[in-house]
Amino acid sequence: MARMYYDEDGNLDLLANKTVAIIGYGSQGHAHALNLKDSGIDVIVGLYPGSKSAKKAEEAGLTVHSVADAAAKADWIMILLPDEVQKSVYKQEIEPHLKEGKVLSFAHGFNIHFGQIVPPPTVDVVMVAPKGPGHLVRRTYTQGEGVPCLFAVFQDASGQARDRAMAYAKGIGGTRAGILETSFREETETDLFGEQVVLCGGLSALIKAGFQTLVDAGYQPELAYFECLHEVKLIVDLIVEGGLANMRDSISNTAEYGDYTRGPRIVTDETRAEMRKILQEIQSGQFAREFVLENQSGKPGFTAMRRQEAEHPIEEVGKDLRAMFSWLKKA
């Protein structure tokens, strides 16, 4: 059974008199920076010249530097940039300033695990990964709560890397909810698998297939949207609150019976075989190489897929329906 660690397990004194540079000020960046600041940590932000986020960070009371200057000034560097740009920013702006004793950290293990970034042996390399979007990390912190985090050590040059990672997790509010120890490999591979097979890829494909099946059978697209997309959140909320059993306890007997008898016909042995194949592609580095090459070539396929998906009929139906939801307008 995995062990969870809480506030009493983290020691913020390990970050006392240290300067933490948050590289990037997007969803996670703003949450990490503000939470650490409110925890009494000295925080600076590193952004590229002309970044639109600089004004937001400064208005929040943070000092903004170039990425290179922030990396030079900091004892702890947290890279919170998109995976595909981290390597170039690291090589050009951060690596030259990685002096012995510093900490290099990430919120996702992709670039370390797949060898895109290779740090010098004289620095600690850790990961602190909140299991929620940045706005939730920030909001729960201000409410005296937190979002659970994963933490991991890739390289322990100081002998304190693990304790330092736990201290950082406490600084952003993670230990209020609980933090779980993992490895860069485990976090990276399970995260990619979850995104591709269940949370993003699998769910999106399932929603579209269900929607299209109903529309092709002559049902109103609006009804198909409600049944196959809109109500997903209602079911997922029940699952998050108490697992599959809680969801099944909350739905009708008709729905529950259909769940047991028809659901397994959707996820077949062939589906599970594809899941294993996708996992192997992740484990072997095939997906990582594909993603890196796609970005190096200017994202032609990625851009085309984005455009094609944005034009799917479900998007137009959803846009029109949501415009009529009075409760959504108020929210």
UniProtKB/Swiss-Prot annotation:
Record-annotated KARI C-terminal knotted domain positions: 183-328
Catalytic residue list: 108
Cofactor(s) recorded in Swiss-Prot or TrEMBL: Mg(2+)
Its biological purpose: Involved in the biosynthesis of branched-chain amino acids (BCAA). Catalyzes an alkyl-migration followed by a ketol-acid reduction of (S)-2-acetolactate (S2AL) to yield (R)-2,3-dihydroxy-isovalerate. In the isomerase reaction, S2AL is rearranged via a Mg-dependent methyl migration to produce 3-hydroxy-3-methyl-2-ketobutyrate (HMKB). In the reductase reaction, this 2-ketoacid undergoes a metal-dependent reduction by NADPH to yield (R)-2,3-dihydroxy-isovalerate.
Molecular-function GO terms, alphabetical: ketol-acid reductoisomerase activity; magnesium ion binding; NADP binding
Coiled-coil stretches: none
PANTHER family linked to this entry: KETOL-ACID REDUCTOISOMERASE, MITOCHONDRIAL
Name of the molecule in the record: Ketol-acid reductoisomerase (NADP(+))
Residues that, per the record, bind NADP(+): 25-28, 51, 53, 83-86, 134
Family designation: Belongs to the ketol-acid reductoisomerase family.
InterPro entries, A to Z: 6-PGluconate_DH-like_C_sf (IPR008927), KARI (IPR013023), KARI_C (IPR000506), KARI_N (IPR013116), KARI_prok (IPR014359), NAD(P)-bd_dom_sf (IPR036291)
Keyword line: Amino-acid biosynthesis, Branched-chain amino acid biosynthesis, Magnesium, Metal-binding, NADP, Oxidoreductase
Binding site for Mg(2+) 2: 191, 227, 231
Origin superkingdom: Bacteria
Reaction it catalyzes: (2R)-2,3-dihydroxy-3-methylbutanoate + NADP(+) = (2S)-2-acetolactate + NADPH + H(+); (2R,3R)-2,3-dihydroxy-3-methylpentanoate + NADP(+) = (S)-2-ethyl-2-hydroxy-3-oxobutanoate + NADPH + H(+)
Pathway: Amino-acid biosynthesis; L-isoleucine biosynthesis; L-isoleucine from 2-oxobutanoate: step 2/4; Amino-acid biosynthesis; L-valine biosynthesis; L-valine from pyruvate: step 2/4
GO cellular component, one term: cytosol
GO BP, one annotated term: L-valine biosynthetic process
Binding residues for substrate: 252
Enzyme Commission no: 1.1.1.86
